[in-house]
Amino acid sequence: MLQIVIPAFNEERRLPRTLRELRRHVAAHRGELGRVEVLVVDNASADATADVARAADSSALPVRVVHCARRGKGAAVRAGLLASDADVVAFMDADGATGLAALETAVQRLRLGADVVIGSRGLDDSVTEARHCRSRSAGAAAYRRLARRLTPGIVDTQCGFKVFRGELVRAAVQDLRTAGFSFDVELLVRLRVAGARIEEIPVTWVDVPGSTFVPARHGAGAFAELARIAWSTRGLAPDPGRVAASGTRSPMPLPAAAALPAAVAVPVVVSLALRSPR
């Protein structure tokens, strides 16, 4: 069985279309995917997110609502993963930005021996359509540079499409501390420490309007989270031999930034990013 976790904060407008497309896709690819259930994690939404999720429940695609009172995408994904019980568990964003054809590819990779399969917008065969302004694109580039220092060998940590062996990821998220948008980085670090074989696959990705990530509001916090992750996972020993990804980077920890309070860590982290080579 495959369970798909969808974190949702005030997603009453975008979620119905995503669930409709997912239901059609699952019906057309039942042979490759098998039985599928969706876990929509209502992240303390102020709108009708939970209601539209329940309305989408059907025999063709069962939809279950999981409630998460702690705000933050990382907290919501963690709650959904812990509520799962399937052999294969995925999470994807509520906006449906990643093409669903990646599901069959990911499931097949798991059958061939991968433990974790993540969508990557940075691979040569990926097709992306972004509408970011220059300032957001520059911030994203700096963030990627830093994230790669914590997850060497992984090209794109932040794509909202990841598929896991259920037992492995449920164990990994037990100690997950990052509640915000940088949770992917901590999760990947912990999975590597657990010896997981991580593979990246190319995806089709479209920037869907209405993102809940607002750079002015969340950008500094995301950088500070990276510093906290570097600090909280210090001393852990990942197994780089188990990572299969396109492109490699040498690990370079950030002890100076990680040891500082968040208010000070952010400018230090940004400074390190600007000084580091591509």
Which role fits each region the language model picked out?
Residues 11-14, 45, 73, 99:
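Donor nucleotide-sugar binding loop of glycosyltransferases
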Residues 11-27:
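Short, well-formed alpha-helical segments that are part of the catalytic scaffolds
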Residues 1-6, 15, 22, 36-41, ...:
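Hydrophobic targeting segments
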Residues 1, 175-278:
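Hydrophobic helical membrane-anchoring modules
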Residues 42-50, 96:
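A conserved acidic beta->alpha catalytic loop
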